[in-house]
A protein has these predicted regions:
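Composition-driven recognition of glycine/serine/threonine/acidic- and proline-rich low-complexity segments
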Residues: 1-252
């Protein structure tokens, strides 16, 4: 198997698969493929077989279906492009060396990689933290390619070193990093600061990848340019609904 990442702003991951080699991805990620590539879409790839494997993927923000792309007979070409400006990051996964990634962060992987929910220290991580706190866990044996949006800042945290991050900027981190929810200090800061209520607290040791273009923030920035009728529908709940909506937007 050969792979390369080409491009800068909107990179693409290209493979040349030898006969019988395969790559898995969530359904709908394909960009192009050669004539010798055979597609098989199933619920059993990427998380173990059966209902439990499907539940793990969906709970982590993934898709019910996964697709396997296999070269049959002759080498085959296969490619996956990013959906947003950003970077494609390969990580080597092995037992005891798992990764946590944001829920839109999985692009593709070798067949023995499993995708599931990243259970965290606090229940609030899955409910109150927005997109940045709903994490997928990448485990198994092989290579996974992650899709992170915007520019990347890579930090190697030392044991006990802590960094508090707006949730949407958490792209990925090694499972050795401790993750929990903290709140922004001060009631005035929460209400009027415009930075939301919750922060992700990351404590080393381990590597973290911070992304500069959270998908939720990009969507929020584009929202103001939508037709007025579409914007008005977001506040039909009245004044209270508007206040709640504003708070939720800031949590992203």
């Amino acid at each position: 198997m050969q792979s390369r990442i080409t491009g800068t702003t909107m990179p693409v991951l290209e493979f040349i698969l030898d006969p019988n080699e395969s790559i898995i991805s969530e359904a709908g990620e394909l960009s192009w493929m050669g004539s010798s590539i055979q597609m098989t879409t199933h619920t059993q790839f990427g998380g173990g077989g059966g209902l439990f494997g499907v539940i793990k993927r969906v709970a982590g923000g993934g898709s019910i279906f996964m697709t396997e792309y296999r070269a049959i007979g002759t080498p085959g070409e296969l490619a996956f492009a990013t959906k947003l400006p950003g970077h494609i990051v390969p990580v080597e996964v092995s037992p005891g060396h798992d990764y946590m990634i944001h829920r839109q962060g999985f692009l593709c992987a070798t067949p023995q990689i499993q995708i599931g929910v990243g259970f965290q220290q606090s229940l609030g991580a899955g409910i109150f933290g927005g997109d940045g706190f709903l994490l997928q866990k990448v485990s198994g044996q092989g290579i996974a390619w992650l899709e992170l949006s915007g520019e990347l800042v890579v930090r190697d945290l030392q044991p006990g070193e802590n960094l508090r991050v707006h949730p949407g900027h958490v792209g990925a981190f090694q499972a050795s990093v401790s993750f929990q929810i903290t709140t922004i200090p001060g009631i005035k800061n929460m209400i009027f600061g415009g930075d939301g209520i919750f922060l992700a607290s990351l404590t080393g040791p381990g590597r973290i990848w911070l992304q500069t273009l959270p998908i939720a923030k990009l969507a929020h920035a584009i929202e103001r340019y939508l037709p007025r009728e579409a914007s008005r529908q977001t506040v039909e709940g009245g004044v209270v609904g508007g206040i709640v909506g504003s708070i939720l937007d800031n949590m992203r």
